[in-house]
């Protein structure tokens, strides 16, 4: 009897299985049921014990918090020095390959330097699901208990005191000792600093000085072993590297105080203009160097050191790091300004250390083998200097791309490519060595290829290219529920698609880049009236809209019929590829 009952129950369960998808469709597709509300994905708690405040997040499995999106804003209170946990590295196509995230749990201990009875701390965080679903930034205001102001204390290398400031437009402001949003995806590896340092060694201001510097650090001691010569040269280079390393750490530490400001368009444009001026100095438009009086004072101080001794050579190298010749000032200033945006002390110090080592490698070779290894001076040295001018010009293009957008960024990169390869083409025409003509042909071809985006912008893209790649869909922007209702009423008998978008939503950008531009998707979307609500700023009116539409995160796409009613089971949450999205649209508008 028991076996018969078990068999009947099993048959009943198997019979109901095909009905489960149909019942699930009544409440939305399976794509939308797999995500939990933000308060469940990231359970936040806090505890204050005297002058110590602990913030903790319990992160649900399969979800993560962005380190760069954690923002702390004290109100009528002062926070002491602290650091955020390093987190784990995460590959992100749009934020960069080296984004720091937190999984499972996060605990932050904050020292309170001063607080009153009415003091508060605004804590903001933002995270996503591994499956491709992002939540809007969450903010919680924490009441603080009053404590007496503590005497000021210095900050260490690994920490910084916070200065409360309002977040910039777009919700990307960061007030924390963590790197800014683009700190980890700067298109600049520290190894590039090594190559730049080696290249700077072959500029007309630096290369002729190496034999003289080699003689100075070795002194009058002619009978030195190879090991001793190598040791003296390395000690000199390490002394120079120490100066540059400390300079990089100091610049990064200063940049920590202004990370939110470093994301402002006005400052990005100003930095881009400064980089352009530095590049012009490399092209010989003007000369940039330390005042001659300061250089003379440093030279006299260096000459007082004992030549041929390890301490004296080390001090000479450290002082040499302060000399800025016309050829080194511009690249060094560009690197310093660039790494100031990272706020990462170790990254900045290591970058400048590699830069100094790169400059010192030719010096070590000269000390060991003499000046015979050095190439002869000539016009090629000036060409090396000009080449670094183009390297510096890449930095303002990167900065302006954030302000002007991807389209103008592509045009600026195209313009830089045309200028660089065109310059290389002219140099190859003037060269007389074998193979220069073939290299000139290659440079000409690269110039024409680089000019393609500019050509498409000025004269329009070819029709066959447009039809192959698919044009970007045109959405009608909406911000409030009233505007959405008005657009639904005005829809000309067509179903309506409402896309909820934000810049901090990675999957939203994947939709825009991969799905919406697919030709089959574009064809199906033409049957819909397209609306889009940009909630990047996470303003109160935008949070109200998300609440009214019962949206817990992005990307979320809603579909309405021609009468303005949301189509049951049509709502999408999370990323969907072009093929699946096309099939979904065909079901809604066959």
Curated annotation (Swiss-Prot):
EC number from the UniProt entry: 1.8.1.8
Listed Pfam families: DsbD_N, DsbD_TM, Thioredoxin_7
Cysteine pairings via disulfide bonds: 128-134, 205-327, 505-508
Mode of membrane association: Multi-pass membrane protein
Catalytic activity: [protein]-dithiol + NAD(+) = [protein]-disulfide + NADH + H(+); [protein]-dithiol + NADP(+) = [protein]-disulfide + NADPH + H(+)
Stretches assigned to the Thioredoxin domain: 457-590
SUPFAM superfamilies the record matches: Thiol:disulfide interchange protein DsbD, N-terminal domain (DsbD-alpha), Thioredoxin-like
Family per record: Belongs to the thioredoxin family. DsbD subfamily.
Protein name: Thiol:disulfide interchange protein DsbD
Organism encoding this protein: Sodalis glossinidius (strain morsitans)
Gene behind this protein: dsbD
């Amino acid at each position: 009897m028991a076996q018969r009952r078990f068999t009947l129950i099993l048959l009943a369960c198997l019979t109901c299985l095909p009905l489960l998808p149909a019942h699930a469709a009544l409440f939305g597709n399976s794509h939308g049921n797999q995500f939990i509300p933000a308060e469940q994905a990231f359970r936040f708690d806090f505890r204050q014990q005297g002058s110590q405040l602990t913030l903790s997040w319990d992160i649900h499995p399969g979800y993560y918090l962005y380190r760069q999106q954690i923002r702390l804003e004290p109100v009528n209170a002062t926070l002491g020095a602290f650091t955020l946990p390093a987190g784990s590295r995460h590959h992100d196509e749009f934020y960069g390959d080296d984004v720091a995230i937190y999984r499972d749990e996060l605990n932050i201990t904050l020292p309170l330097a001063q607080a009153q009875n009415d003091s508060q701390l605004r804590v903001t965080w933002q995270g996503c699901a591994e499956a491709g679903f992002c939540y809007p930034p969450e903010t919680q205001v924490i009441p603080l208990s009053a404590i007496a102001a503590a005497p000021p204390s210095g900050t260490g290398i690994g920490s910084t005191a916070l200065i409360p400031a309002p977040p910039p437009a777009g919700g990307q402001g960061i007030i924390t000792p963590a790197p800014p949003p683009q700190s980890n995806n700067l298109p600049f590896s520290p190894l590039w600093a090594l190559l730049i340092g080696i290249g700077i060694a072959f500029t007309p201001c630096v290369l002729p000085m190496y034999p003289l510097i080699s003689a100075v650090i070795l002194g009058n001691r002619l009978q030195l072993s190879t090991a001793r010569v190598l040791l003296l040269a390395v000690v000199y280079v390490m002394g120079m590297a120490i100066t540059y390393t400390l300079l990089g750490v100091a610049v990064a530490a200063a940049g920590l105080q202004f990370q939110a400001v470093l994301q402002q368009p006005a400052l990005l444009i100003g930095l881009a203009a400064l980089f352009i001026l530095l590049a012009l100095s490399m092209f010989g438009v003007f000369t940039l160097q330390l005042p001659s009086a300061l250089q003379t004072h440093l030279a006299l101080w260096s000459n007082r050191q004992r030549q041929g001794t390890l301490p004296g050579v080390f001090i000479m190298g450290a002082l040499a790091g302060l000399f800025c010749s016309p050829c080194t000032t511009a690249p060094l200033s560009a690197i310093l300004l660039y790494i100031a945006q990272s706020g990462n002390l170790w990254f900045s110090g290591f970058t400048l250390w590699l830069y100094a080592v790169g400059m010192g490698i030719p010096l070590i070779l000269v000390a060991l083998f003499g000046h015979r290894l050095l190439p002869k001076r000539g016009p090629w040295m000036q060409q090396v200097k000009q080449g670094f001018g183009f390297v510096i010009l890449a930095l303002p293009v990167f900065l302006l791309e954030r302000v002007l957008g991807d389209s103008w960024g592509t045009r600026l990169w195209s313009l830089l490519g045309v200028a660089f390869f065109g310059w290389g083409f002219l140099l190859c025409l003037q060269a007389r060595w074998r193979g220069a003509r073939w290299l000139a042909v290659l440079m000409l071809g690269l110039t024409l290829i680089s000019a393609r985006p500019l050509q498409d912008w000025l004269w329009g893209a070819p029709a066959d290219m447009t039809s192959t790649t698919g044009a970007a869909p045109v959405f009608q922007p909406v911000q409030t529920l009233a505007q959405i209702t008005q657009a639904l009423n005005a829809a000309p008998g067509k179903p309506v698609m409402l896309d909820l978008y934000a810049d901090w939503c990675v999957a939203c950008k994947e939709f825009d880049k991969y799905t919406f531009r697919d030709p089959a998707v574009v064809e199906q979307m033409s049957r819909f009236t397209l609306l889009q609500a940009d909630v990047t700023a996470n303003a109160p009116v935008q949070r109200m809209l998300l609440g009214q539409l019962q949206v817990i995160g992005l990307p979320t796409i809603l579909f309405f019929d021609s009468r303005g009613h949301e189509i049951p089971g049509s709502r999408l949450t999370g990323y969907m590829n072009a093929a699946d999205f096309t099939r979904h649209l065909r079901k809604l508008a066959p």
